[in-house]
């Protein structure tokens, strides 16, 4: 039944790729906002203060102080899509580490990665390269024995990952889609495997398997399995139908009562290393705890906490860390009677928009995607050193774009409409959005008031033609589109007379400073990604397949053609010399004749997936960002040659000049600030950073 997987020299050369730890801290600093998704936690048995944290974007963070603070440590995988659900230190030689990863986007991609130098370099183990590894365990009695659960079965290594053998029946319909594995603490041939359907067990290293579903509800997705090290016949497992316990090594399971249906998806179980009667259950409905081996349970966190992993300090079991969705790391020193966020230095946030305050550049505003009530809008009054959340009224909406009016009012384009913030202590209010052509009307109407004091914004910016603030409308007078069905507003631009919003229901415009917006298609196209307004009055509008250019504030549009080999559009920029820069899936394209002809430029730029080219007026240069580039590209010669900044360790979606440095919105790690000064101080306009793809909870 077992089949050995041979690691040939050719395969070794192809896939045993080294993933190195960059000197990220010397080039860039993560500003936050802190928090976000954490997938896994693991401590060093020789020094439990040394903890590694895994994310759903292939990153490892490290803590040297027991989880009180974090630093970006390593990036694993070729892209940003590896979900790192399992991290194991070899107890006999803790510089040896194993990490299991699976691709968020491709079921045919995944790895087990090994480091022999404490995580400074990594290599993918070639024999299991390409497997979507969802579970990883090390035998407590033999640390050279590793077992992985993948979508195509169960595999074992008895030499620290050098070679692997399949120990589940090949092409067997039931023992596949493995989500959890556990190894008996005394006998490494006794292995439990949980599938998307039910649990299985082998007692002879995979020679034979038998179902251990007796006592369980059918079609139970098995998330986690633990075996009591002090009494191996006691087995706990969690499934979508609840938590089960067996006292006879899986022959019969009993469903544990006491945890409500709302928390029934228990993603992880962990047992107190000193008191085996204490078991923690990390669920989608909070952290639950039992003191009597599962007979009774109590909720020990807020019920909306989604727990992905649990770490218990072996020296002091009352010290517990949780890896959570959206909330980052939660930490407790008293068994979770009390707990606090512990995210200093850790950010796994998808930035939808970032702007610098027009009058006070130490004030930064950020909108995030995918974090629901723990996301929304954040602001900093000290240049990103600390952040506060202000999302009341957003109702868990994602913020895809941000802009600030001259009055100081913040406007947010969300996944359901446009909102504005009259006061940081108040609630966000929806702007009226109406499908149809904008009727002729006066432009001299009151705008929403500033979220700061009227005195601070009693006059407009120098050179502005807009009127000062007079009052705050109590509510929109007309809402033709129901708020729940409001368009997805991917990009906002504020110009002198007309404001613009690129949405999935057309281009919306406002002439009353954001109180009311009218939207309609442009040249028959309704689904737009981004709109840009430039100093010369020109506008660019980009949809997934079309690009448009206007030189008269959007009164008329010209569709710009582009090469047929281009399969995806990201952004179109007009630079001061009048030339066009197009960011595409096939790289950066440049046109000097209004889009009649295009040149695919490299000169140091990546050949594919250039998000956008920006003009940095303060630095008198072009900036560009690209997928997986882990930095920002700059050109001082009009785009003929490009140099990349220092390694950020993470993918960057957009960048701006901020006080002489680059302020960048990363793909998954919040804001980053370049450490070295490069140009004169400048408060830049807002940057649009894009949207997130599926969450790691999706299989």
Predicted regions and their residues:
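Extracellular glycan-interacting surfaces
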Residues: 4-15, 22-699
């Amino acid at each position: 039944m077992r089949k050995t997987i041979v690691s040939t020299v050719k395969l070794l050369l192809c896939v045993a790729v080294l993933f190195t730890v960059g000197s990220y801290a010397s080039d860039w600093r993560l500003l936050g906002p802190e928090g976000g998704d954490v997938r896994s936690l693991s401590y060093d048995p020789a020094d439990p203060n040394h903890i590694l944290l895994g994310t759903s974007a292939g990153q490892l963070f490290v803590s040297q102080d027991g989880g009180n603070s974090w630093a970006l440590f390593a990036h694993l995988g070729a892209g940003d899509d590896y979900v790192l659900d399992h991290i194991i230190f070899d107890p006999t030689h803790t510089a040896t580490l194993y990490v299991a990863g699976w691709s968020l986007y491709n079921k045919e991609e995944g790895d087990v990665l090994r480091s022999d130098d404490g995580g400074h370099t990594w290599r993918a183990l070639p024999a299991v390269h390409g497997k979507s590894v969802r579970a990883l365990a090390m035998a407590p009695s033999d640390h050279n024995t590793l077992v992985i659960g993948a979508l195509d079965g169960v595999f074992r290594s008895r030499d620290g990952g050098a070679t692997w053998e399949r120990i589940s029946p090949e092409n067997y319909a039931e023992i596949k889609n493995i989500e959890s594995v556990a190894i008996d603490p005394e006998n490494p041939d006794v292995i439990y495997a949980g599938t998307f359907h039910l649990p299985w067990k082998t007692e002879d290293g995979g020679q034979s398997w038998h179902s251990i579903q007796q006592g369980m509800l059918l079609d139970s997705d098995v998330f986690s399995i633990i075996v009591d090290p002090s009494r191996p016949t006691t087995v706990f497992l969690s499934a979508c139908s609840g938590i089960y316990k067996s006292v006879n090594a899986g022959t019969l399971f009993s469903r544990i009562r006491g945890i409500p249906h709302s928390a029934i998806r228990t993603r992880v179980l962990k047992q107190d290393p000193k008191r085996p009667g204490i078991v923690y259950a990390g669920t989608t409905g909070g952290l639950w705890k039992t003191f009597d081996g599962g007979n009774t349970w109590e909720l020990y966190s807020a019920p909306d906490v989604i727990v992905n992993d649990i770490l218990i300090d072996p020296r002091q079991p009352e010290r517990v860390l949780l890896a959570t969705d959206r909330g980052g790391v939660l930490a407790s020193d008293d068994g979770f009677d009390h707990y606090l966020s512990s995210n200093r230095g850790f950010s796994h946030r998808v930035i939808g928009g970032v702007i610098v305050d027009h009058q006070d550049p130490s004030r930064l505003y950020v909108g995030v995607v995918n974090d629901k009530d723990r996301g929304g809008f954040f602001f900093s009054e000290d240049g990103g050193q600390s952040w506060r959340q202000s999302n009341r009224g957003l109702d868990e909406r994602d913020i895809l774009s941000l802009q600030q009016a001259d009055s100081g009012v913040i406007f947010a384009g969300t996944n359901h409409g446009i909102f504005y913030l009259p006061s940081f202590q108040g609630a966000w209010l929806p702007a009226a959005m109406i499908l149809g052509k904008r009727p002729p009307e006066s432009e001299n109407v009151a705008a929403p008031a500033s979220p700061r004091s009227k005195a601070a914004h009693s006059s407009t910016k120098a050179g502005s033609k807009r009127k000062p603030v007079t009052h705050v409308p109590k509510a929109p007078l007309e809402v033709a589109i129901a708020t729940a069905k409001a368009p997805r507003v991917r990009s906002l631009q504020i110009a002198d007379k007309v404001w613009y919003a690129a949405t999935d229901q057309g281009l919306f415009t406002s002439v009353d400073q954001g109180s009311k917006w009218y939207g309609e298609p442009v040249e028959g196209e309704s689904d737009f990604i981004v709109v840009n307004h430039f100093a010369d009055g020109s506008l660019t509008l980009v949809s997934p397949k079309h690009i448009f250019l206007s030189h008269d504030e959007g009164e008329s549009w010209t569709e710009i053609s582009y090469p047929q080999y281009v399969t995806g559009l990201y952004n179109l920029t007009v630079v001061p010399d009048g030339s066009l820069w197009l960011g595409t899936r096939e790289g950066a394209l440049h046109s000097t004749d209004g889009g009649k002809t295009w040149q695919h430029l490299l000169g140091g730029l990546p050949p594919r997936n250039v998000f956008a080219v920006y003009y940095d007026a303060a630095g008198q240069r072009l900036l560009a960002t690209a997928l997986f580039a882990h930095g920002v590209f700059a050109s001082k010669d009009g785009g003929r040659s490009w140099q990349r900044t220092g390694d950020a360790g993470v993918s960057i979606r957009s960048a701006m000049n901020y006080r002489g440095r680059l302020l960048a919105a990363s793909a998954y790690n919040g804001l980053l600030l370049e450490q070295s000064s490069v140009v004169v101080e400048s408060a830049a306009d807002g940057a649009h950073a894009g949207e997130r793809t599926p969450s790691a909870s999706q299989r």
